[in-house]
C-alpha cells in the first residue's frame, strides 16, 4: 500500500516536471487593470487572446490543442449559461471553479491519461458594483485570484519576477493607469519575463533583482523579439457601447504606444 502511494506521488511529480518543461519557453501573458477596464497583452506568432463572453476574456500558454479545447469549453458554457438564465449568471467565479478547473485537475491527477499542458489567464470586467477581476488557472487546476495584476509565464520563478517588477513601480496596484500607461508597463513586464527565460545568458538568472532590468535593456529585448513576433493586446473596456466590452487594440494604437519605432524588419 505504501509502495503504491509512493509510486502515485512519483508519477504526479513526473507529470509536473513534464508539463513545466513543455511550457517553459511559453510567451508570457500580462493582465492589468487600468482606468477604463482591463488590459491583456502578450507577444506571439499566432492568436492567443480571445473573448469568452461580453465581459470576459482569456489568454493562455501551453499546447495549442489543449488551449483550444479549454477555450471552446469555457466559451460554449458561457453562451449556454447566458442564454438559459441571465448574463449576470455568467461570472468568472462560476466558469473558473465549475467549468475549467475540474477537467484540468482531473487530467492532471489521472496518471494513466495525458495531462492538460496549459496555463490560463482570465479577466472579468466589473459589473453591478463588483470590481474587475483577474484569475490564473495552473496546469494542475489550482487558481489565483487578483484584483489589479495577473501574469502567467513559463515557470513560477518567471511569474514571481514579473510581479516583482510591476510591484516596484506601484502603478500595478492602481486602477488610475491610462491605457497607454498600462500598455507600457505590461510590455516592459513581458520583456522582463522573456529575459528571465534566457538562461544561456550568464547575466540573466531567475530570481535576479528586478533593478537590473532597466528600460533600455527591456526595449532592446522587445525590438529583437518583434522581428519574429507581434504584439497582441485587447481590453475589456467599461466605456465601450454595446453588450460586448471586448476589443482588440489596433495596429495603429500599438505602434503609438510602443516606446520605440518599429522598423521594416519588425512586425
For the regions a language model picked out, list residue spans one by one.
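Long, low-complexity N-terminal extensions
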Residues: 1-267
Amino acid at each position: 500500500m505504501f509502495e503504491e502511494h509512493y509510486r502515485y506521488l512519483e508519477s504526479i511529480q513526473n507529470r509536473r516536471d513534464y508539463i513545466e518543461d513543455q511550457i517553459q519557453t511559453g510567451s508570457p501573458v500580462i493582465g492589468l487593470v487600468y482606468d477604463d477596464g482591463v488590459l491583456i497583452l502578450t507577444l506571439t506568432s499566432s492568436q492567443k487572446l480571445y473573448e469568452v463572453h461580453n465581459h470576459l476574456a482569456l489568454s493562455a500558454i501551453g499546447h495549442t490543442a489543449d488551449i483550444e479545447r479549454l477555450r471552446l469549453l469555457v466559451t460554449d458554457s458561457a453562451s449556454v449559461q447566458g442564454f438559459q438564465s441571465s448574463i449576470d449568471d455568467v461570472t468568472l467565479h462560476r466558469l473558473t471553479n465549475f467549468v475549467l478547473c475540474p477537467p484540468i485537475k482531473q487530467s492532471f491527477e489521472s496518471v494513466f491519461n495525458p495531462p492538460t499542458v496549459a496555463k490560463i489567464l482570465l479577466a472579468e470586467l466589473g459589473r453591478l458594483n463588483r470590481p474587475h477581476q483577474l484569475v490564473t488557472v495552473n496546469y494542475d487546476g489550482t487558481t489565483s485570484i487578483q484584483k489589479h495584476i495577473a501574469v502567467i509565464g513559463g515557470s513560477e520563478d518567471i511569474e514571481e519576477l514579473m510581479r516583482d517588477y510591476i510591484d516596484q513601480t506601484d502603478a500595478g496596484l492602481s486602477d488610475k493607469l491610462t491605457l497607454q500607461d498600462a500598455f507600457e508597463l505590461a510590455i516592459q513586464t513581458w520583456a522582463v519575463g522573456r529575459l528571465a527565460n534566457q538562461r544561456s545568458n550568464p547575466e540573466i538568472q531567475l530570481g535576479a533583482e528586478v533593478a537590473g532590468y532597466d528600460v533600455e535593456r527591456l526595449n532592446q529585448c522587445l525590438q529583437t523579439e518583434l522581428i519574429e513576433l507581434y504584439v497582441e493586446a485587447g481590453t475589456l473596456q467599461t466605456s465601450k457601447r454595446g453588450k460586448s466590452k471586448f476589443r482588440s487594440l489596433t495596429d495603429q494604437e500599438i505602434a503609438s504606444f510602443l516606446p520605440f519605432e518599429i522598423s521594416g524588419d519588425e512586425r
